[in-house]
Amino acid sequence: EMTQERMAVILEEPIYAAKDWSAEIVPDATIDDLDEVAIAKARMMFKKVHSRIPAEEVNAWNVQTFLSKCGLTRNGGITRAAIILLGKYESAFKLRPAVVQVTWTRRDKNQEVVDYEHFTVPFILTVDEILSKIENLTLREMPGGTLFPDTMKQYDDYTIREALHNC
């Protein structure tokens, strides 16, 4: 049986004691470390997600304001998440010793590697390239009462993208 003292200690423990690694500021990073094409795509996606904010308003924000609204800067500093999502290739080295890379690997029936490719920042642009490499078979099912099969992908693209973003 648990004592009242032990119960009190457990209940007073912080729920999220660990720091968010991706939210930490990269000390020597600047806006110049970010890819302009990646920022443009992020801005376009932001306008889709936040459609209640007029597009003209979002377009009028300077890069620093936009990154702040996205939560990719903290107190004006560029976060690790900003480098991972929007950074130029050479900016990834500012995150060392972390290796900012996803490796796609194709294996044969004996699990021998027959092909591979490395992908790196900016992941907002490369995630679609990675997705295109993943074998996602089209499944066909014959429902009753029809001559035409229903088709669906083996894996939902949204789910795969979510897993890639969480990498």
Task: Indicate residue ranges for each PLM-predicted region.
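Conserved N-terminal catalytic/coupling substructures associated with nucleotide/phosphate chemistry
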Residues: 1-167
